[in-house]
Amino acid sequence: MINISFPDGSIKQFAKNITAYEVANAISMSLAKAAMVAEINGELQDLSIVIDNDCKLRILTAQDPECLEIIRHDAAHLTAEAVKELFPETQVTIGPAIENGYYYDFARDKPFTTDDLAVIEAKMQELSQKNEQVTRELWDRDKAVEFFKSIGEHYKAEIIASIPAGEPITLYRQGNFIDLCRGPHAPSTGVVKHFKLMKVAGAYWRGDSRNEMLQRIYGTAWATKEQLDSYLLMLEEAEKRDHRKLGRELDLFHFQEEAQGMVFWHDKGWSIYNTIEQYIRKKIRKNGYTEVKTPVLVDKSLWEASGHWEKFRDDMFALETDDKTLALKPMNCPCHVQIFKQGIKSYRDLPLRMSEFGLCHRNEASGALHGLMRVRSLVQDDAHIFCAAEQITDETVSFCKLLTEVYKDFGFTDIKVKFSDRPEIRAGSNEVWDKAENALKEAVEQAGFNYTLNPGEGAFYGPKLEFVLTDAIGRQWQCGTLQMDFVLPERLDASYVAASGEKKRPVMLHRAILGSLERFIGILIEEYAGRFPLWLAPVQVAIATITSDLNDYALEVQKALIDNGVRTDFNISPDKINYKIREFSNQKIPMIAVIGKQEQENKQVAIRRLGTTDQEVLSVEQLIAVVKEENEKYL
């Protein structure tokens, strides 16, 4: 007999060589019917797994969050099975679960069409309703390679041949379809009920542009119809808010082929950019940061010394000149260390908080570029805090408070923190890591945050905090970071004189709140759906006259607004007033100042706020005061 421990603390005895499914059935038939996979000693396994030793067991159903990835992986296999039935000449390659769904890559001469997706999805529904049994099989490596070659699946044969010797070769069979997979999977295809195929894209085999192009089908799958419908509704809303679409409509920016991944900022977009920079500059000055500016083009010797050349060479833009190799900086940190090293630093100078709106360049693959979210030229709201080890907690608490203030000002209050601790391969002793991790944990707790742990995901040079925002339609965006670094000060020979008179290495805290300004503006465009708050809007007040004989007064109003720092636009054309209001509303301008005969006589304006039909009559001085008060809260 073996002892099996359950999540409720109970321990029950079972005969040896019992399966997880049989245990579930012994507990209740309803649990066995709903069961998808088993968690045995913390590891997910198929329900068919034979248990022959004492263990901890948890039976998982579709209600458990861990099963969402199982459902999506099952859906990927179901997609491949449907494709093979409909298009037998197609070769299958890989199909993992990803965030919010899955994909499967196929090799075929003819691209899939939108009509093909509809047919494939219908076939998937049919196969799901068949509720085919899914079974796991252990194969000999050579036989598996020969088998897949014999059925024309050369990509699968190549994958199996590349698996390290000694690793088991497991295949999963459902109906007439068989696939290489580690698993686990649900016991039958019927668990995949709520899914949709989304799109087709190209993808290189093994992600290498030198290899052949494959056809990638993206899909989404969920545990319930309500979850699927909610996700599709969110995508529909996200499409309306797409920053690339709104960027064109609101005349904020554009991209073009001659400068891939580089933003052409238009007047209104550049206004938003500069306003955000002005806002951040005010915040960091109040929090004791200095601001610096470092070169964009730096000799590769610095990047070699810092370690970036070895790790990021392929992502850097480099050029040869005067027998030297120069590189556009992909990040600011090595340059900030150079400033820190100018002159002798004492413990009294610490902490030293050094910020920069640093222009960086990264050679992103053209296929990875995505509007403002993924660019090749970017400016980070970057800062580095040089401090002593005993100052880490206080500096982290201070940063967390600053970050919270900034996010709140932009309307983000749902902030999640991820804590990445020591990886297996790392610099520094366990004692150093213990102190560093404890300092960050203590700081996060003092700042009032809960955190989730990403075990082993820290950089080799220190633990890391990531700050994730949730937007208006439920999407999550990782923006802020705080990365501790023991290594770069050592590599670049940065030091300070301690109170004892000895030289010590400072700890370096890499930190950003927005990340890149480009990406954060993209997030804001989608968060606000283009309706920027008054202080941030590129045009704060638009002036519209009812008749042309009021134009002189309108120009007087505009001059008064501009003289007081209000960003304005105006329309004094002969067009009808309703047309003018509609046009300004479509441009999502927060305040429209309508001027009629009465407003001219009383030196007033009739204010209509975006999204309302109500009008508020204000003097020009009152209007200026309203906008100024809003601006002064932030700028």
From Swiss-Prot:
Question: Which InterPro entries did the record assign?
Answer: aa-tRNA-synt_IIb, aa-tRNA-synth_II, aa-tRNA-synth_II/BPL/LPL, Anticodon-bd, Anticodon-bd_dom_sf, Beta-grasp_dom_sf, TGS, TGS-like
Region named Catalytic: 242-533
Required cofactor names: Zn(2+)
Catalyzed chemical reaction(s): tRNA(Thr) + L-threonine + ATP = L-threonyl-tRNA(Thr) + AMP + diphosphate + H(+)
User: Where does it live in the cell?
Assistant: Cytoplasm
Q: Which Pfam families does this one have?
A: HGTP_anticodon, TGS, tRNA-synt_2b, tRNA_SAD
Identify the EC number(s).
6.1.1.3
SUPFAM superfamilies linked: Class II aaRS ABD-related, Class II aaRS and biotin synthetases, TGS-like, ThrRS/AlaRS common domain
Group of enzyme by EC: ligase
MF terms in GO: ATP binding; metal ion binding; threonine-tRNA ligase activity; tRNA binding
Report the co-factor binding details: Binds 1 zinc ion per subunit.
GO cellular component, alphabetical, reads: cytoplasm
Residues the entry annotates as binding Zn(2+): 333, 384, 510
GO biological process annotations for this chain's record?
Answer: threonyl-tRNA aminoacylation
Q: Which UniProt keywords apply?
A: Aminoacyl-tRNA synthetase, ATP-binding, Cytoplasm, Ligase, Metal-binding, Nucleotide-binding, Protein biosynthesis, RNA-binding, tRNA-binding, Zinc
Keyword Nucleotidyltransferase assigned to the entry: answer is no
> The TGS domain covers which part of the protein?
1-61
Enumerate the HAMAP family for this protein: Thr_tRNA_synth
What is its biological role?
Answer: Catalyzes the attachment of threonine to tRNA(Thr) in a two-step reaction: L-threonine is first activated by ATP to form Thr-AMP and then transferred to the acceptor end of tRNA(Thr). Also edits incorrectly charged L-seryl-tRNA(Thr).
Task: Please describe the quaternary structure of this protein.
Answer: Homodimer.
Q: Which family does it belong to?
A: Belongs to the class-II aminoacyl-tRNA synthetase family.
Name of the protein in question: Threonine--tRNA ligase
UniProt organism field = Rickettsia conorii (strain ATCC VR-613 / Malish 7)
> Organism classification, top ranks?
Bacteria, Pseudomonadati, Pseudomonadota, Alphaproteobacteria, Rickettsiales
Gene of this entry: thrS
